[in-house]
Amino acid sequence: MNKDHEEQLEINEVSQKNKYKSIIESLLFMSGEPINIKDLATILNCKQDKVSSLLNEMKNSYVGKDRGIKILIHNRAVQLVTKPENSIYVEKLLKTNIRQSLSQAALETLSIIAYKQPITRVAIDEIRGVKSDRAIYTLLEKNIIKECGRLDVPGKPILYGTTEEFLKFFGLDSIEAIPNLEDLLKEFSKEEN
């Protein structure tokens, strides 16, 4: 094998490696959750050892740089996370964006839960007149509501209530600090007339 051919193989190998790293980074970014190394290997159609090696190279490339993210590898799963020293700024962003990131359905559902808690999904659906599964899922994911028990009836449906995060996000000291529903309804009807 001549020297030019060896150099070409090396260039191709580096190019393939960089392509894999790019794909892995995209997958980690879009997932937002830990991804099993085995799943990454399946997606990339390569061996788990190769994925582990690529991940370690990527992890090392983030260390010591002025980057806001790092790769976290734990129990054969990997996740792209923000660096702890930036957490104060990330929290500020999340607090300002929470209201913007909630759909109308999620805001309606959250209002019902805040005023009627603890409440079941079926009761929420009856008040809204439509299914609320997706809105409830979104609110649970954002840790704005929580499961706070089960109703003691056949089927034992889950009861939902607000969390401490709900209070923080809306700047409330306690759940009692939310405006009285009757007062809001009176104010709303005055504005319409």
From Swiss-Prot:
As for family, the record states: Belongs to the ScpB family.
Q: Which domain of life is it from?
A: Bacteria
Main subcellular localisation: cytoplasm
Q: How does it assemble?
A: Homodimer. Homodimerization may be required to stabilize the binding of ScpA to the Smc head domains. Component of a cohesin-like complex composed of ScpA, ScpB and the Smc homodimer, in which ScpA and ScpB bind to the head domain of Smc. The presence of the three proteins is required for the association of the complex with DNA.
UniProt subcellular location: Cytoplasm
**UniProt keyword terms in alphabetical order:** Cell cycle, Cell division, Chromosome partition, Cytoplasm
HAMAP family under this entry?
ScpB (MF_01804)
GO CC, one annotated term:
cytoplasm
UniProt protein name = Segregation and condensation protein B
Give one GO biological process term: cell division
Q: Which residues fall in a coiled-coil region?
A: none
